[in-house]
Amino acid sequence: MSALCIATIAFAQTSREEIDAHPNLAISTHSVYAGALYAKPIAEAPKGYEPFYISHYGRHGSRCEANAKYSAELVKAFDFAEQKGLLTAKGKEAKALIEKIHATQEGRFGELTPAGAEQHKAIARRMYQRFKPLFKRGSIISSRSSTYTRCILSMAAFNESLKECEPLIETRLVASESDQKMIRPTGPIANEYHHNIRHNIRHDWNDILDVWAAKQDFSHATNALFTDIEPVCAHLGKSKLELISSIYKRMAFMQNLGWHDRSLIDSIFTPEERHAIYKYENYRIFCTYAGTSLKDSDRYFATMNLLVDDIVKYADLAIAGKNNASADLRFGHDYYLLGLLATANFNEIRMDYDYSDVDKLAEVWRSHQFITMASNIQFVFYRHKKSDDVLMRILHNENDVTLPIASDTAPFYKWEDVRKYLNDRAASFRK
């Protein structure tokens, strides 16, 4: 369904205004956790209801870059440019910074950084403060993780923080191959999907993005860095946008290492160029991992059904008094959290937008608001003190979100309604 003209969100700022105010967000899903920027008070529970169970899925926190090849490629590019006499004085400064960023991550690519651990500790502290009845003495907290080290250490940091809040809770941490099909997409369909991405199998959206990219002007950044960028692009086999975007992302990624001096990057890239890079990344992420409006996307989102099934299963057990854990926590990856958001299709986080216009998409779907490092979703269940009546709410990045479900108590819903909605959504992708 095309939804560009019927967006259910009314953003207070344009995407340009938002990125200008918070330039670190221009690298989209690679930005540090942005929850604090959008924090709002959550709704009070209806009278008589108390929390008794929480189900959670969180992306790992800030990490080193996933693969050495990204920064290594730029080190080689700047070496080539220097050898050919193509670097400006500013380009030489950028070369030194890129080399420093690469060297700092050497041997640690893909690993959690201290900033990432602290993000999860802070989220855990806020979870404890909001839902203290779930973390009283003797409570069991069950956590499962992707087998990637960054996810395991995110899980450990989260649980360590909960134990600091209440030392007498029992934390059970598991990172097992048996959980991986639930924690992250696996199987033939997901593997085929990721293979196509890695090997640049063309889709219709690639053509749309190419036409848009050809109209973008990066002359300030290119002239600031190089006396002539064309030989560097030819040497790497990349377009001008691909090279300039990669340079920006590598330099801006330093926020995940705890470095926050933007003076060099902001002297190279104009606000217009920064915003164009953001729109490029935003569009690519929507079309790669989030948009349910894309052709054949249902085949990929069908791989999320095991996570939906797991959430439903353990919630049902908790309601029936057969789940001895008061919290089921899961630690995984950005693309699976995006898949869960696509399945839920919250009123505030629609995933069914038209993708025919790169600029317009950035005004209705903004990746940095949905999926940064440590982004998370929390399903919180409440029971009435004097009955067995159960309501639940959903928090995305610690803020209330709503569903297209009738409720007199929104953002609180009857679990049976949410259960049916999630199962129906998941089933629609299974077909």
Language model features by range: what are they?
Residues 13-140, 146-328, 332-431:
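Signature for phosphate-centric chemistry
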Residues 1-15:
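Bacterial Sec-dependent N-terminal signal peptides
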